[in-house]
């Protein structure tokens, strides 16, 4: 038995033994293209945690279009036996940004390496499996099979507002895609942000230093402040940041650069009888960073954070500028004073400990 597997099993046992008291309430907001990959495995970490109550999953477009993202989320829940968790349809399009405006921007300032649902050309020999571009209302054939269950009635924004009112001060919004659904909830209810306990978001980019100049470094080599979850809908990011959340924790690209889904992880997952581990092993994402998984993990176990920094943060929404969608930061109190929030940005994590938490969660 490998040292990694032994450590994982011990961690899983200790977590199960310590799961007592009130369960932490969370809503997962995802652009859940699948099967497998960071979007799905991150949700599984929360779903598998014995001290977490996942109230629901809200879905928007981003990595994929909303219709296909919803289908993949529903099918994942079927495969891991969690059809008790409702899935709500959210935004199909960004608030202002569009494929046409993005293409005009590229004509002036150069190509954006990754464009999610708008991708028409992929890098050769990419670790990511290229997906053929299609219209928003098309759901391509699904490797994992089509879901039998349906999305819940109502919109994602309505669900977010309703649950925040029902459990004031208790709910974490775990956002791992663009912030369109969150922004719509903010606009729907002025008290939404005040009713939420905290907002965790995998988004923004400060100055990521990838371990090598691989395909995931290309996006940040010349544009270190651009992150896809912001660039898809910069206006939504600004609205969410300015909404008045009591606590905002950002997991930017920087913190994720040392993480990877490794071949050893895959072999470990293959030996597990857990439905979540079986799903992850059947649809592996070997070689890819664990972006969203890390965001859930530092919420589950803040001790994984090696270094974080408090800063004021905002986003460039000047669509005609070269910096449209880029992250803007200042030392607290040194910004322009236009309502930019103070956030906690995770800079580095204890990678080996995170790997154990990641595997233990899926194998539980």
Functional labels for PLM-detected ranges:
Residues 9-18:
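Hydrophobic h-region of N-terminal signal peptides that target proteins for export
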Residues 22-24, 41-54, 221-222, 228-364:
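Conformational coupling and interaction surfaces
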Residues 86-94:
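A short, structured active-site edge motif that brings together acidic residues
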Residues 93-97, 256-258:
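A short acidic, often aromatic-flanked loop/helix-cap motif at beta-alpha or helix-coil junctions
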